[in-house]
Amino acid sequence: LEGGAFRNKIINNDTTGEKILVSFYRSPRYYYTKDSVSFDNDNETYFGSDSTWIVRYKKKSVLPNKMKTWELIVTDTGSSRAFWRKSFYKDGVGFSIATQTDTLSQPSTFIRSFFESFVPADTLKGVNPFEKKSHLFFADFLSNDSVLHKRAVKHINDIDLDSSDLSQLKTVIEWMNWKEKKYLDTKASLINKLGDIKTKPSADYLKQLYYALDDTVQLQYNALESLLQHKTQYAYNVFRDIINTEPPVLINSIGDYADYRYYSPLLAASGSGFDNGKFLDELSDSLKLTRTILPALLPLLNLEDYKSAIMKLLGEMVDSNLVKPKDYEMYFGKLMIEAKQELKKQSIAEKKKAIEKAEVDKEEKKVSVYSYYDDADKDTGNDDLSLYATLLLPYWETNTTVSPLIQQMLKSNDKVLKYNTMLLLLKHNKPFPDSLLTFFGSLDEYRYSLYTDLKQLKVSDRFPALYNNHLDLGKSSLLSKKTYGKPDSVVYVDRLITEYKGKKGFIYFYKYKAKKDDLTWKLATVGLVPEDPKQFEYEDSTTYSISPFDTAPFSSYTYNKYSFTEFSDTKLKEDEAVVDQLKKRLRKILYSRRKSAANFYDEDSDKASPSDYMD
């Protein structure tokens, strides 16, 4: 239990079918938090941060043994059902009991007696989460007791350190040697902790480490990554001095620019750091700071290791209006000639693909659309070419070679490249044929993307009027939910009026077949669509807290609570009226959004989890 624990058990009443969820929680040995108020709030709002909960009862008290208790009963609008929870906490050890009841009747004897008599045993000793654990951690790490040392190594990432711990952290980093099992991983984890200590002495020590580790390039990456995680001008200046004179050789794809914020929007929203050893992606976290050291970064365009990452970083700055053409004009010629070469490669690849497709069609060996979503024919775009376009576009007025090059990209047979180039021109108010908007509006796989992109750019009036209707946009938005395995057929069935969370509109129903030879149709839905034919969707960005036991950056996510657009596995029956089946499906998807016991409990095990949609 030294590493922390969370356990669940469901107590069943076989006679009444009632269930009570019993949970146990123990803080890890090195857990530390400064915010006791936030801790209390977590226990008082266990069922999430959703403001639509109706609190029927709330009580906080302290038992004679100094164990804190919280009791909470909440309900939802339009429902007589309620959740009843009671929590207990003392020195890093917590218990909770939770159940579902009905406000129309009194709790049963089973439920009432359990809640009234449940008292956790206080024999299990925990740790005070409000006391710093750094001294305990360092003592364990340097201990001759292998059990204590291994425990500390295992939980390096859990320990919370600040500037007062810098001296001890330096001691353990320098104390380590190759006799340590998993030496590189352990030392890397310790160096990563320096990224949490955002002081000048810490930055100076990271610089010292960088040069001392010149024979272990992987650890040099960690030193640079931690340095950039400080997000201070001093640290960035130290990084500039290093990268300008002694840039490390990049191996093992370390130079591949992988912005983790793209893959994990939760991390981006939280502002949390992310240790992956790829220090270059840290530069995009604070573009304004990166702009101050840009002159030292641009020469790296001449190094193959760094070229791609620096180009993408420069592209982000161009998009953010942080750089002007004059800031990198000395590299214009290099970018232009490389872009022309890339365009030639794109043209050759497109011709080759067209020939291969013709041969496949001739031999009737086309890949199954169900399995691969037309992977044999699907356009993939050209990220490199799009990036060159972004970097060269600022020279549109001053250099006559830019416009013809980008116009050639618009003529590409690759629809992804064509679409991205069109959006780039649209974003920067550059001319392009209006026929392109009609072309992409006519395509099911692009129509909804075009609609949302134009809306985001605040030029919705340029969306083709011919396709600005619920049915065409509905089919396209539905298909956008399929990243692969495109259905063979999607056919509109009917629509039903409904109301959800104060918004009234339609749920559109479609039937689809995954494969042409499927015997039955399945149902899909699109909505909630406003009644106004000129509007297609309600905007919303609800933030949902997952659980009080989850820590940032994974404690919440954002979604549109008015979106019911999805493919279902519900089959359309031939022996039942279609409208009745649609009404039944509508009730099901609306009920699925309720905070119901069906989602709160996992019937097949002793585990429990909150609903995926608790709004």
Describe the residue ranges of each PLM region:
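Amphipathic alpha-helical scaffolding segments comprising HEAT/armadillo-like alpha-solenoid repeats
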Residues: 129-139, 162-178, 199-211, 233-246, ...
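Signature of long, low-cysteine stretches enriched in small and polar/charged residues
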Residues: 1-89, 191-193, 204, 222, ...
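Surface-exposed amphipathic alpha-helical segments
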Residues: 1, 47-48, 97-138, 575-606, ...
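Coil residues (strongly favoring Ser/Thr
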Residues: 15, 35-36, 50-51, 77, ...
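Short, well-ordered beta-strand elements
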Residues: 19-24, 92-102
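Acidic, Ser/Thr-rich low-complexity intrinsically disordered segments
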Residues: 135-168, 612-615
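Structural detector for internal amphipathic alpha-helices that build alpha-solenoid repeat scaffolds
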Residues: 150-162, 184-199, 218-232, 251-287, ...
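Intrinsically disordered terminal tails
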Residues: 377-402, 407-615
